[in-house]
């Protein structure tokens, strides 16, 4: 690992799930180059008893099991060794469907930190007391439920790592893609010029960079307005525009 490289630490019952897809393609190459590092902290050894139990029945009754606060705390303590205490420099995140929605802005903030600790839940969740005591931020990948946080953790790390300098060969690509300016990305095309009687828009073949930029901006606005009205309203509000205006998108 290169000095000062971004670090990801994962507290999980399934350390064998990593690096998973993070070990492939550009993120995998960057991992090999030492541009970032990945460490898993197995929750099981911190468990109690002969079977290293990590969970117990939910207080008040109900289905499923809950990860115990004392056991999760020991794992978080192990994960925090050598990390700064300020959460802005090193966020500690619990992946939860009730958390704050993950966003590109969040990924940018994390990429600018020194590293990140992710707690992958299982069963019915984690005892709330440890989340409160350790100032753990709850983050959601979307409005759906997974059997555990490992898949979500890989997605969040991928979105963050690709923003680290030198991970992507072309930094400009991160500036043009979806959400970089609050808009969805414009449509992309490549050769052949004609495929099944469908042609690449003429403006993209014109070589006129200003016209291409205008077309891409208009398409990005059109798609955002059609598919993500929430993003469109926020985009317009930030620019003093009426979201219902008609600009021939």
From Swiss-Prot:
Swiss-Prot/TrEMBL keywords: Cytoplasm, Methyltransferase, S-adenosyl-L-methionine, Transferase, tRNA processing
State any GO CC term: cytosol
**Quick check: keyword Cytoplasm in the entry?**
yes
Entry annotated with the keyword Cell inner membrane: no
Stored CDD domains: TrmD-like
Recorded hits in Pfam families, A to Z, give: tRNA_m1G_MT
Principal subcellular localization: cytoplasm
UniProt-listed InterPro entries = Alpha/beta_knot_MTases, tRNA_m1G_MeTrfase_C_sf, tRNA_m1G_MeTrfase_TrmD, tRNA_m1G_MTases_N, tRNA_MeTrfase_TRMD/TRM10
Substrates-to-products reaction catalysed: guanosine(37) in tRNA + S-adenosyl-L-methionine = N(1)-methylguanosine(37) in tRNA + S-adenosyl-L-homocysteine + H(+)
Enzyme Commission number(s): 2.1.1.228
Instruction: Please provide the Gene Ontology terms (biological process) for this protein.
Output: tRNA N1-guanine methylation
Q: What molecular functions are annotated in GO for this chain?
A: tRNA (guanine(37)-N1)-methyltransferase activity
Under SUPFAM superfamilies, the record lists: alpha/beta knot (SSF75217)
Which function does this protein serve? Answer: Specifically methylates guanosine-37 in various tRNAs.
Q: List the PANTHER family hit by this protein, alphabetically.
A: TRNA (GUANINE-N(1)-)-METHYLTRANSFERASE (PTHR46417:SF1)
- In which family does this protein belong, per the annotation? Belongs to the RNA methyltransferase TrmD family.
Q: Which NCBIfam families match?
A: PRK00026.1 (NF000648), trmD (TIGR00088)
Name listed for the protein in its UniProt record = tRNA (guanine-N(1)-)-methyltransferase
Organism (species) = Cereibacter sphaeroides (strain ATCC 17023 / DSM 158 / JCM 6121 / CCUG 31486 / LMG 2827 / NBRC 12203 / NCIMB 8253 / ATH 2.4.1.)
């Amino acid at each position: 690992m290169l000095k000062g490289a971004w670090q990801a630490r994962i507290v999980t019952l399934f350390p064998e799930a990593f690096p998973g897809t993070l070990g492939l393609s550009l993120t995998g190459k960057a991992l090999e180059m030492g541009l970032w590092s990945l460490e898993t902290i197995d929750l099981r050894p911190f468990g109690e008893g002969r079977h290293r139990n990590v969970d117990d029945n939910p207080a008040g009754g109900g289905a499923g099991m809950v990860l115990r606060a004392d056991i999760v705390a020991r794992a978080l303590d192990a994960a925090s060794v050598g990390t700064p205490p300020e959460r802005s420099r090193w966020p500690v995140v619990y992946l939860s469907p009730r958390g704050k929605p993950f966003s590109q802005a969040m990924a940018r903030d994390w990429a600018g930190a020194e590293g990140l600790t992710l707690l992958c839940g299982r069963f019915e969740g984690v005892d709330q007391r440890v989340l409160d005591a350790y100032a753990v931020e709850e983050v959601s990948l979307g409005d759906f439920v997974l059997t555990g946080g490992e898949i979500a953790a890989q997605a969040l790390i991928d979105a963050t790592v690709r923003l680290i300098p030198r991970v992507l060969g072309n930094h400009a690509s991160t500036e043009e893609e979806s959400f970089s300016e609050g808009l969805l990305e414009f449509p992309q095309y490549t050769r052949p010029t004609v495929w099944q009687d469908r042609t690449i828009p003429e403006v993209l073949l014109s070589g006129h960079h200003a016209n291409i930029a205008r077309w891409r901006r208009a398409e990005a606005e059109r798609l955002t307005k059609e598919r993500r009205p929430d993003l469109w309203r926020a985009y317009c509000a930030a620019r003093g525009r009426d979201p219902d205006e008609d600009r021939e998108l």
